[in-house]
Design a protein with these regions (language model features):
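A broadly conserved sequence feature marking short terminus-proximal activation segments
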Residues: 1-61
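Short, positively charged, Gly/Tyr-enriched micro-motifs
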Residues: 46, 51-54, 60-155
Length: 155
């Protein structure tokens, strides 16, 4: 290992949030879960109606369950900027479709982790929901969406 090189520590890469277009800006560790504060890396400041450059209006926080590390639930708090167009008054949010589906409560990585748990490791929905820190109903409904994608991709 004489030629071993190391990169600087990067929590975004370690948690694979960079694959979802997110960057970790802070963390808080609790005994029963971990909370990661994130921001969306890509800018989305152009109006989708008229094409003018929007003005940052405010920020909202979207909470997602992410894949657990060491069976500790990981919750991601994503700061999503809202923009307003000065020309047509249209208001929109930054695009975070790379990280999660609209109105989803699990990140795309959490859905992938849960499907792997069901298909490969034969875990129950209750165990997956517990590991993700969500209710059984949320885990079951999100897995139903992933199951349709999994089965639909086979044909």
């Amino acid at each position: 290992m004489a030629n071993t090189t190391f990169d600087r520590p990067d929590l975004s890469a370690f948690t694979r949030l960079d694959d979802l277009g997110l960057e970790v800006t802070g963390q808080h560790m609790w005994p029963d879960n971990a909370v990661l504060a994130c921001r969306i890396v890509g800018e989305d400041q152009w109006c989708r109606r008229c094409g003018c450059q929007g003005v940052a209006r405010d920020t909202v926080v979207r909470r997602l369950a992410h894949e657990p590390y060491g069976w500790r639930p990981t919750i991601v708090h994503v700061s999503v900027r809202r923009y307003r167009c000065p020309e047509c008054a249209h208001v929109w949010r930054q695009d975070m479709s790379q990280a999660a589906d609209p109105r989803a409560q699990l990140s795309r990585a959490a859905v992938r982790w849960a499907l792997t748990g069901v298909v490969v490791h034969h875990l129950t929905v209750a165990r997956i929901a517990q590991a993700l820190g969500v209710s059984w109903n949320i885990g079951s409904s999100e897995l139903g969406v992933g199951d349709r994608v999994l089965v639909g991709g086979c044909g």
